[in-house]
């Protein structure tokens, strides 16, 4: 069965219930949340996340598996500012607790940025941070995300992710989130040779570690190292390649999460594309008028 959904918002008093309601309105059977704003560390207590009501709604709507994404501000690759590193370690520990409480198994993490110290120093610092965070007892896996290589990001290549995994003591608590836009922008040819890319991933990291897919088109050509998401079928990856990935038999059991941009010229009135993109991928048929239809208020 195809597991497909999108990033949804967990906010207000409803929190997890609101997230599940939004996902169900898109026809999704999985979804991804941030436990608070991705740009800061302000978080509600576990008791305020409305977990029980959210889980009941999920069960009633056939949503079994959800994913949590750690905030962007965590940087355990920072060797120059140890306060930033320590904040990342402490916050990641708390985020694992929240993820466990919600009942999610995967916590997606941007590995980190070396901020000028060099890739090797950044990778070693990420290993150090993960070794401080991970415990034998935890059930949650941290899913290291494949990165585009923008700025000083670490994790652009499969080899870099494998290096991190190999250096971590409890690396059974590590998995990988494969982002289509990021891997494309990092230089992997997922358009013409996705099977070859998947074989390379399996050889270097192992397909058994692949636990989350972020399905995004890209505004930029392959190898641009930009990381700018585009709506499904309207970018440089294209619908055919993304549809092939979404329905790939080796990836059937992996949740596929859309993080494509909201649609509209008016910044204050942009519309989510997810209901339409999910339907399009389920039908395996591209609608080149989709963005106009969403703009026009298509239900």
Swiss-Prot record:
UniProt protein name: Probable endonuclease 4
EC numbers: 3.1.21.2
Example of a GO MF term: deoxyribonuclease IV (phage-T4-induced) activity
Keywords: DNA damage, DNA repair, Endonuclease, Hydrolase, Metal-binding, Nuclease, Zinc
Binding site for Zn(2+) 1: 69, 110, 145
Residues reported to bind Zn(2+) 3: 182, 227, 229
Similarity annotation: Belongs to the AP endonuclease 2 family.
Co-factor(s): Zn(2+)
Note on how the cofactor is bound: Binds 3 Zn(2+) ions.
Binding site for Zn(2+) 2: 145, 179, 214, 259
Functional description taken from the UniProt entry: Endonuclease IV plays a role in DNA repair. It cleaves phosphodiester bonds at apurinic or apyrimidinic (AP) sites, generating a 3'-hydroxyl group and a 5'-terminal sugar phosphate.
Pfam (any one): AP_endonuc_2
Reaction equations catalysed: Endonucleolytic cleavage to 5'-phosphooligonucleotide end-products
Annotated organism of origin: Geobacillus kaustophilus (strain HTA426)
GO biological process: base-excision repair
Enzyme's top EC category: hydrolase
Gene: nfo
SUPFAM superfamilies membership: Xylose isomerase-like
């Amino acid at each position: 069965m195809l597991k497909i959904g999108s990033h949804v918002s967990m906010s207000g008093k409803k929190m997890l219930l609101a997230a599940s309601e939004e996902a169900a309105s898109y026809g999704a059977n999985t979804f991804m949340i941030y436990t608070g704003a991705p740009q800061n560390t302000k978080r509600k207590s576990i008791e305020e996340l409305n977990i029980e009501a959210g889980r009941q709604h999920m069960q009633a709507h056939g949503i079994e598996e959800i994913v949590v994404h750690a905030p962007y501000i965590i940087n355990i690759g920072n060797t120059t500012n140890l306060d930033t590193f320590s904040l990342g370690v402490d916050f990641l520990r708390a985020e694992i607790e929240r993820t466990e409480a919600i009942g999610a198994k995967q916590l997606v993490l941007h590995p980190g940025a070396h901020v000028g110290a060099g890739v090797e120093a950044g990778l070693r610092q990420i290993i150090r941070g993960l070794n401080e965070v991970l415990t034998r007892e935890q059930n949650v896996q941290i899913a290291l995300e494949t990165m585009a290589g923008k700025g000083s990001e670490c994790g652009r290549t499969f080899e870099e992710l494998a290096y991190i995994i190999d250096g971590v003591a409890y690396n059974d608590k590590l998995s990988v989130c494969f982002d289509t836009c990021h891997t494309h922008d990092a230089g992997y040819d997922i358009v013409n040779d996705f099977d070859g890319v998947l074989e390379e991933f399996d050889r270097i990291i192992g397909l058994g570690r692949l636990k989350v897919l972020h399905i995004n088109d890209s505004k930029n050509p392959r190898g641009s190292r930009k990381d700018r998401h585009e709506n499904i079928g309207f970018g440089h990856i294209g619908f055919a390649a993304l549809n092939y990935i979404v329905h790939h038999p080796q990836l059937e059991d992996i949740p596929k999460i859309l993080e494509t941009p909201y649609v509209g010229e008016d910044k204050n009135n942009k519309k989510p594309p997810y209901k339409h993109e999910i339907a399009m991928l389920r039908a395996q048929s591209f609608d080149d008028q989709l963005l106009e239809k969403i703009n026009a208020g298509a239900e």
